[in-house]
C-alpha cells in the first residue's frame, strides 16, 4: 500500500492511498466464495454452482462491496502508519480504478490540533468563601413563603404585589394590533411582566374601574413592528386580590417533603440545602475563571468537523428544551457557533491537561460527589444505589470529577486570591455579578 500526505492547511490533510490490485482481487474472490456456498440458482445444487456462473452473476456487487470495505480499512491503516489523528470522517475521492489494476483514492480530512497546554501562571482566580448566616436563612424562608403565596379578593385600591384580574385592549396609531388584547388575565403588579408603565398605571385602581394607559414599547422589544412605538391600552380591572403568605407550620413544611418536624427541623433542612447550593456556586465560579484563563492562555485552531458536530448537538438540545414543531437543522447555525467553539476548545484543552498530568478519576471523589447529589433527595440511599447500577451515569460523574481534578491542577499553578463575601454575593450568577 502506497501512502502520501499533503498538508493543505493547519489542520487539513490530503492523503493519497494506493491499494494493490492483488489485495482487491483477494477480497473480491473471498466474497464470491462466500456467495457460492449459499447461492440458490435453478439447475444447480446449493454449494455446487460453478464459480464462472457465480462470477457472472455476482462479481459486480462483490467488487463494489470489497472496494467500500477496502477504502475504509486502508484509510485507517494509513492514518496509523502516518501517525495522524483524524477529527472526523474523510471525504473520499477515487482517482483511478480499473479492473485488474491498483486502486488509487484521495481522502481529505482534518486532524486534531497538537499542542501543549501552557500559561498556568498567567491565570488569576478569585476564590470566594462565605457562610449561611441566620439572616440569609430568614431571607430564604421568606422567599419560600412568597413562592407559595395565595391571593384573596380585597375591597380596596390596588397596590404593588397585588394580583389583578384584568381585560385590556391595546392600540398603536389608533389600530388594534395582534397580541395586544386579552380578557380575564391575571397580573401581579410589580412583577415586570408587562412593558414599562403598564403595571405602574394600575396602582391605585379598584375593581370595576377602567383606565387608559399611554405607554411606549421598548426599543429592544422582541416584536420589531412594535419596538419604540407609543401605544394606548384600555384596561378594565375585574378584581383586586391581596397576597397572603402561608404560615410556617407543619402544613407548609410538608409541601417540601422534609421529614423533620417543627420550625427548627425545617430551618435545619433549608440551611443544608443552602450550604449545598453555596458550595456548588463557589466551585462553579472558580471553574469558570480557570476555564476562561486556559482559553486565554492557549489559543488553538479547532477542526471544523468538531464545530459542526457541537453546533448540531446544541440545536438538538434547544429543540428538546423549548419544544415546538421546528426541526434542529432549521435553527440558524450562527446562534450556536460561539458557544460551540468555546465548548470544543475547552474540551481539547481539558483533554490535553488530563494527558499532560496523567490524571485519572479519583474514586473517593466520585463516591463523595454521588453522596452530595443524593443528599438533595428524600431517599438518598436509593439514589446512590441507582447511580452504581447505571454505568452511563457513573461515567458522567467520573467525567465531572476528572474536570474538577483539572481545575485543582491549574489552581496549584495559578495566582489565587481568597475573598470572603456574603452568601448572597457568593451564589449570585456570574452575569448578574458583572452587571453590578
Swiss-Prot record:
A Pfam family annotated for this UniProt entry: FKBP_C
Full protein name: Trigger factor
E.C. number: 5.2.1.8
Entry similarity comment: Belongs to the FKBP-type PPIase family. Tig subfamily.
Major localisation: cytoplasm
PANTHER family in alphabetical order: TRIGGER FACTOR CHAPERONE AND PEPTIDYL-PROLYL CIS/TRANS ISOMERASE (PTHR30560), TRIGGER FACTOR-LIKE PROTEIN TIG, CHLOROPLASTIC (PTHR30560:SF3)
GO cellular component: a single term: cytoplasm
Domain of life from the UniProt record: Bacteria
Free-text note regarding domains: Consists of 3 domains; the N-terminus binds the ribosome, the middle domain has PPIase activity, while the C-terminus has intrinsic chaperone activity on its own.
Molecular function terms from GO: peptidyl-prolyl cis-trans isomerase activity; protein folding chaperone; ribosome binding
UniProtKB keywords: Cell cycle, Cell division, Chaperone, Cytoplasm, Isomerase, Rotamase
Residues in PPIase FKBP-type domain copies: 161-246
Function: Involved in protein export. Acts as a chaperone by maintaining the newly synthesized protein in an open conformation. Functions as a peptidyl-prolyl cis-trans isomerase.
Cellular localization per UniProt: Cytoplasm
Record flagged with keyword Translocase: no
Reactions catalysed, as given in the entry: [protein]-peptidylproline (omega=180) = [protein]-peptidylproline (omega=0)
GO biological process: 'de novo' cotranslational protein folding; cell division; chaperone-mediated protein folding; protein transport; protein unfolding
UniProt xrefs under NCBIfam families: tig
UniProt keyword Cell cycle present: yes
